[in-house]
UniProtKB/Swiss-Prot annotation:
The keyword Transmembrane helix does not apply. Belongs to the plant CAR protein family. Changing residue 87 to A: Impaired Ca(2+)-dependent phospholipids binding and reduced abscisic acid (ABA) sensitivity, as well as altered membrane localization and PYR1 binding. Disruption phenotype: When associated with disruption in CAR1, CAR5 and CAR9 genes, reduced sensitivity to abscisic acid (ABA) during seedling establishment and root growth regulation. This is Protein C2-DOMAIN ABA-RELATED 4. Keywords: Abscisic acid signaling pathway, Calcium, Cell membrane, Cytoplasm, GTPase activation, Lipid-binding, Membrane, Metal-binding, Nucleus, Plant defense.
Length: 177
């Protein structure tokens, strides 16, 4: 005797808008937390998701060029980026953090942009007290894709910035934008 399949419950794909690829490019003038340098890495959190880059040893101007990909179910969520100094024998030291909204980027994605020339600036986000931008952030149409470049000024620390770039990945079968 076979049993009937239970009614399908909602899956992650039903709520998933798509994937947000955050390229952590580099750190600039990060704080010294060891004797003469730091061993920095970045942790990115959005909702319950948490991802991290590799550690770059003895460098306050590290180049990660590392992609961290988050699944997006809510465009109102903010992304928290925290830089840490890796320590071998003690707790890792915090080297500052920055927060940014993905909503302006998502809103630009929802526009019909096909046919725009590569390099077209679609929108800009200005630095303000409500965001951690060190300079104006441009959302640009590049080779058929929308990217947003960010220079984030770290908070709760004496100095340091992190350069990052956002890119969207559509997933077949997801709710989409």
């Amino acid at each position: 005797m076979t049993t009937a399949c239970p009614a399908r419950t909602s899956s992650l794909m039903d709520d998933l808008l798509g994937l947000l690829r955050i390229r952590i490019k580099r750190g600039v003038n990060l704080a010294v937390r060891d004797i003469s340098s730091s061993d920095p890495y970045v942790v990115v959190k959005m909702g319950k998701q948490k991802l991290k880059t590799r550690v770059i040893n003895k460098d306050v101007n590290p180049e990660w060029n590392e992609d961290l990909t988050l699944s997006v179910t809510d465009s109102n969520l903010t992304v928290l980026l925290t830089v840490y100094d890796h320590d071998m024998f003690s707790k890792d030291d915090k080297m500052g953090d920055a927060e940014f909204e993905i909503k302006p980027y998502i809103e630009a994605l929802r526009m019909q942009l096909d046919g725009l020339p590569s390099g077209t600036i679609v929108t800009t986000v200005k630095p303000s007290r409500r965001n951690c931008l060190a300079e104006e952030s441009r959302v640009t149409w590049v080779d058929g894709k929308l990217v947003q470049d960010l220079v984030l000024r770290l908070r709760h620390v004496e100095c340091g910035e992190v350069e990052a770039q956002l890119q969207w990945i559509d997933l077949p079968g997801s709710k989409g934008l």
